[in-house]
Amino acid sequence: MSAAEIVAQLSDGMTLGIGGWGPRRKPMALVREILRSDLKDLTVVAYGGADVGMLCAAGKVRKLVFAFVSLDAIPLEPWFRKARESGALEVLELDEGMFQWGLKAAAFGLPFL
């Protein structure tokens, strides 16, 4: 499937998990396709980097579940920071251990571990 075909199957208000860690190994072709789409009000679950910043800048994110959002050399991704400080998005910030165990529980179909 192409990135456009995948994004065409998504709908407003969905929860999307974005793989990778910080600014590394991100599915940026999919992120760019989401940016070109009319999708909105997304809940994004991610160890964030530029992907989260770009989606926040475009107003695509309603809620972000994260452990951190960083560009490494820039400790706090600027577009995410602006969205958070302005109150444009709801956030659930977890420490890295809780975030990782939450993802593991979800993979097993459990509410918690």
Q: Which residues does each PLM region occupy?
A:
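Conserved alpha/beta enzyme-core scaffold
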Residues: M1-L113
